[in-house]
Amino acid sequence: MLSYIKKSLVESNKAHKQLHIHNVPANMIVPFANDIDYTAVFAKIQKIIPSSLVNNVDVFYVVNIENFQRDNVSFNALYKDGAIYISPEQDSETDLIDDLIHEIAHSLEKEYQDEIYGDGNLEREFLGKRKTLYHLVDKPTLSMVNYNNAEYNKQFDLHMYEDLGYDYLRMLAAGLFYSPYAITSLREYWAIGFENYLLGDRSRLKDLSPVLYNVIYSIINNSEEYS
């Protein structure tokens, strides 16, 4: 994979002007499948994300990789080993912005581990919602033990995606989670919250998840541009 990216990067740099998001290079290994105004997208990301919050990202790649598939579910972006990989299969500029913000959120988890997870309050908020959801589900096919696990679990993910379905969960969990995908794991609860703090209905997020909201507020407002 790395040799493929390096070879493609040389060819890409010959054809395209080097792009950046806050001085982090953004490399087009594969062109977007749809007519995406990526320069406008990158400019918007720079406006809404303080530069100090991309310190853990070394490079952005637009490229196809195997990791965009997990358990027969497709993803459009991935943060791994200091790089954010972006699928060229983006429906719109809005989808691309969502994906970038979401993966930047994941890039912050190690640096801000104590602030996000250290006191356990965010996990308690998340699992409290999971337990409430369990009692709302009509004849759940998994036990409470599964709902009380904050980590990603393939069996639980399939239960959410296949047994219950996101449409059902969207209706059932509207008063608990900002979106059904936030139910997946504590890490996704964090990333969905960060994404929608910046792009969604901030007041709704605060009402639904006050602990999550306050963690995000603190990290963003204590970043160097806001200090």
Stretches with model-predicted labels:
Residues 3-28, 64, 73, 204-227:
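C-terminal or late-domain output modules
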Residues 8, 31-38, 42, 145, ...:
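Intrinsic-disorder-associated interaction segments
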Residues 13-97, 118, 128, 135-146:
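Auxiliary, metal-adjacent structural segments of Zn-dependent hydrolase domains
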Residues 97, 103-123:
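Catalytic Zn2+-binding segment of zinc metalloproteases
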Residues 120-131, 191:
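Short flexible/disordered coil segments
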Residues 126-165:
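Low-complexity, serine/threonine/proline-enriched polar segments
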Residues 156-227:
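Pan-zinc metallopeptidase signature
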